[in-house]
């Protein structure tokens, strides 16, 4: 197949209509050299200008020769080239992470809106087979996407519908590590996939079709559940078990750093179905937070000293704390405040958040704040943000949610002042 034939195939997909500056990832192998020659030949038709990004991994004697050739080619054709040198302990994952971080930096610094890679149809089939062998979720059988968001723009794979054998054979370098059976992809490419083809000559096309159908199925599910308030427990639990399963899967996909095992997924689903309020650790400082009416996955941010500090409000000196303004006043007739706390002492009032063992005196008995919050069915966030008012070491009030709980005064107490409280957001 000629580059003209390839151009005729991909021009209908309008990959580059929104782009002017395109960065090409070039290793020096046959696939990326095909991509470089193709995009260079059709720059005018595609209305783009191109640049080359190359990573010298320094793992083979040929690495420097590849870099030198690409620099010479770029100079001859007046194409900008950007080169990085891999650092650190080498592994497939580390090298891939380094490459894409480098590509992202160049896109941002040099104002490229698209990164283009040379993945083709055979890469897609290999990827699907690898994921099947690993036991990946259905969602991941959708395989490699032709276009996806990346850095400041998009990552485009224009050859993804073209097989390797359909590509021309330009001058290129051979990476002999591609023959090493130490790498899973190489075992799939040279052994497992050929075995499948011996059973079914159309195995590659079948795997690609499976990928396409999986993608359509997931898109249909997303379209049908779009706008569903699944964070609300009543809405989530109103769905069938099958829909709940895929809703949670879809939600977890929004947390790329949170790769959990299937057993952990099943545990999360079970916890949500139980509807028991609480904070449930997952991994990597993420947790599942179940409130009275909803659930959310969030990253746990350690409380700072500022969050934990207490403040003291003295007679005649207003103070802001926890989203409220507190005013300690001897004017017992002042009106128009959100909350009014009677004070039977002129000693300063300490404002703080709850602590283990806190109790509020309610007359003939006292109650732990923990039990008070449970009985009031307050959310975990409301409990964490609750404000405790203390005078002379005794809790005199608690603000939690939209409720205020007061210490029961004795019959001998005489009101000497009031604590006026107003929400700052109204001011």
From Swiss-Prot:
Q: Where in the cell is it found?
A: Cytoplasm
**An annotated Gene Ontology molecular function:** tRNA(Ile)-lysidine synthase activity
- Location, primary (coarse class): cytoplasm
Q: What class of enzyme is it?
A: ligase
Is Ligase found in the keyword set? yes
State the Gene3D superfamilies in the record. HUPs (3.40.50.620)
The answer on whether this UniProt entry bears the keyword Nucleotide-binding reads: yes
Q: State any GO CC term.
A: cytoplasm
EC annotation from Swiss-Prot or TrEMBL: 6.3.4.19
Amino acids binding ATP: 27-32
**Annotated catalysed reactions:** cytidine(34) in tRNA(Ile2) + L-lysine + ATP = lysidine(34) in tRNA(Ile2) + AMP + diphosphate + H(+)
Question: Which HAMAP family does the record associate with it?
Answer: tRNA_Ile_lys_synt
Q: Which family does it belong to?
A: Belongs to the tRNA(Ile)-lysidine synthase family.
What does the entry note on its domains? Answer: The N-terminal region contains the highly conserved SGGXDS motif, predicted to be a P-loop motif involved in ATP binding.
Q: What does this protein do?
A: Ligates lysine onto the cytidine present at position 34 of the AUA codon-specific tRNA(Ile) that contains the anticodon CAU, in an ATP-dependent manner. Cytidine is converted to lysidine, thus changing the amino acid specificity of the tRNA from methionine to isoleucine.
Listed name of the protein? tRNA(Ile)-lysidine synthase
Biological source species: Streptococcus equi subsp. zooepidemicus (strain MGCS10565)
Q: Which gene encodes it?
A: tilS
């Amino acid at each position: 197949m000629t580059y003209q034939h390839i151009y005729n195939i991909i021009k209908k997909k309008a990959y580059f209509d929104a782009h002017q500056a395109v960065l090409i990832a070039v290793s020096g192998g046959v696939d990326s050299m095909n991509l470089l020659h193709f995009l260079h030949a059709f720059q005018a038709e595609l209305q783009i200008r191109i640049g080359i990004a190359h990573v010298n991994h320094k793992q083979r004697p040929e690495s420097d020769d590849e870099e030198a050739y690409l620099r010479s080619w770029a100079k001859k054709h007046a194409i900008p080239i950007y080169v990085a040198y891999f650092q650190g302990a080498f592994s497939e994952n580390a090298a891939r992470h380094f490459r894409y971080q480098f590509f992202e930096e160049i896109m941002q610094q040099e104002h490229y809106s698209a990164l283009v890679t040379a993945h083709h149809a055979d890469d897609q089939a290999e990827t699907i087979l690898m994921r099947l062998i690993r036991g990946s979720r259905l969602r991941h059988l959708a395989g490699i996407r032709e276009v996806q968001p990346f850095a400041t723009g998009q990552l485009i794979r224009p050859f993804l519908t073209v097989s390797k054998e359909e590509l021309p054979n330009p001058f290129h370098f051979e990476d002999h590590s591609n023959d090493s059976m130490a790498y899973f992809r190489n075992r799939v490419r040279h052994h497992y996939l050929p075995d499948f083809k011996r059973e079914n000559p159309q195995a590659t096309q079948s795997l690609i079709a499976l990928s396409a159908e999986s993608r359509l199925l997931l898109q249909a599910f997303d379209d049908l559940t779009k706008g569903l308030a699944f964070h609300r427990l009543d809405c989530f639990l109103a769905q069938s078990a099958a829909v709940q399963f895929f809703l949670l899967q879809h939600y977890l996909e929004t947390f790329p750093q949170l790769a959990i095992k299937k057993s952990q997924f099943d545990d999360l689903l079970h916890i949500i179905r139980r509807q028991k309020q609480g904070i449930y650790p997952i991994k990597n400082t993420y947790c599942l937070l179940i409130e009275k009416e909803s659930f959310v996955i969030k990253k746990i941010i350690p409380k700072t000293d500022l969050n934990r500090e207490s403040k003291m409000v003295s007679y005649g000196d207003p103070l802001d704390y926890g989203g409220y303004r507190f005013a300690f006043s001897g004017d017992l007739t002042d009106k128009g405040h959100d909350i009014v706390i009677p004070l039977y002492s002129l000693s300063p009032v300490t404002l703080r958040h709850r602590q283990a063992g806190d109790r509020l005196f309610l007359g003939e008995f006292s109650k732990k704040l923990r039990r008070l919050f449970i009985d009031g069915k307050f959310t975990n966030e409301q409990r964490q943000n609750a404000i405790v008012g203390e005078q002379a070491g005794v809790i005199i009030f608690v603000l939690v949610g939209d409720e205020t709980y007061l210490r029961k005064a004795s019959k001998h107490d005489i009101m000497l002042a009031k604590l006026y409280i107003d929400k700052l957001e109204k001011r």
